[in-house]
Amino acid sequence: MSYVYFRLPHSTHVFRNRLSTEPEEIASLAELNGRRGFVIAPFTTSDDCPILLLPTDWEEVNLNFSGDNQNGEQTHLSSNDGVSAMLLDADYEKERQRYAVDFHNYHGQLTNDAFQKIVLARSARLTATEKLSPLTLFARACHRYPRMFVALFSTERSGTWLIATPETLISGTDGAMQTMALAGTMRLSGANLDFDVEGGSIGKDDIHWSTKNIKEQRYVETYITECVEQFSDDVNVEGPFTVRAGDLVHLRSDIRFHLKDTAHLGNLINALHPTPAVCGMPKDATRDFIINNESGERNYYSGFSGLLDPNGDTRLFVTLRCMQIEGEGEATAYRLYAGGGLLKDSQCQAEWEETEAKMNTMRQLFKHI
């Protein structure tokens, strides 16, 4: 049975939809104009990774609910089952070698001025010493990451994915919309672990952003603002400021605007996605390069998901911190994804460490709370 669970940022309400049929497949983002539903979109649409549109037949569930459903299937939605697991990565050295080759290839394009910025992604396929159900991992993500959009979905076409992401693609109600330019990454440590306010002052004086991070975020902000201005005459940019996502912080600008015509919401989404935060600049050239040169397939990583309603509430989020859950029982594996924006002055070791830090968002879920 296909299903989706989700919880919005800064909310305690969890909703689910268990589908009796497979979701509708959409050929292009522009075809989302005038449509309503829960959208699951890949980095780039293909026969293997279509855009999926699910109906909005939601029921609210208790995060601590545990039991059997009416079909006798076990339904477990508790974050406190007392189980911790060690994650094993048998291919770690091979992954590092592949990443180094990709980095050299990507960085060469930057030094030759082919691109201003490009995002290099990788994945790691892990096994665990204990098996944790997708619902347990979802519940733990809700508990650990209250600021993030958390979703768990499973369909025949997409497979099973768990997402905990800090980045909004677009949100709003009745045409009053907001998006964000999120880029730049630093790991919190020491006293900075107390940093707990979006745009606030706790630890602010101790968080110093490098020129590379500031430049990367500015690229993203400029691109997204220019996209939005095609669909709105009223655009307001606030930021950048520092926000927390797990044990990481990012630079973020908020971009608020009024959509001229809500019937063209799909066109706006098509213009925004993929943003420079997951792709690069210029958009089309870097996307084509990624598709043809990246060692692994991104699939639904760096796509987006969430609620779509042109005449109501829209809440779409970029699929950043995520894992794909493959197989069942003893054969279960967890494929974690992460990426980072490369500029001319990027260094391979630092970028590898950034992807490791981002993957820790998912790794932490295997530890008992």
Please describe what each predicted stretch is.
Residues 113, 170, 222:
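Conserved hydrophobic/aromatic pocket- or pore-lining residues that grip, position, or stack substrates
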Residues 107-123:
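Charged, compositionally biased non-catalytic regions
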Residues 1-99, 133-137, 151-169, 175, ...:
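Cofactor- and metal-binding active-site motifs of prokaryotic enzymes
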Residues 2-11, 127-215, 219, 312-339:
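An anion-binding catalytic pocket shared by soluble metabolic enzymes
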Residues 61-97, 102-104, 126-127, 180, ...:
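Contiguous alpha-helical scaffold segments within structured protein domains
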Residues 119-124, 154, 240-242:
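Short, surface-exposed recognition loops or helix-turn segments adjacent to catalytic cores
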Residues 255-369:
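Conserved hydrophobic core element of enzyme catalytic domains
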Residues 40, 118, 150-154, 298-306:
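A short glycine-rich, hydrophobically flanked beta-strand micro-motif that places a catalytic Asp/Glu
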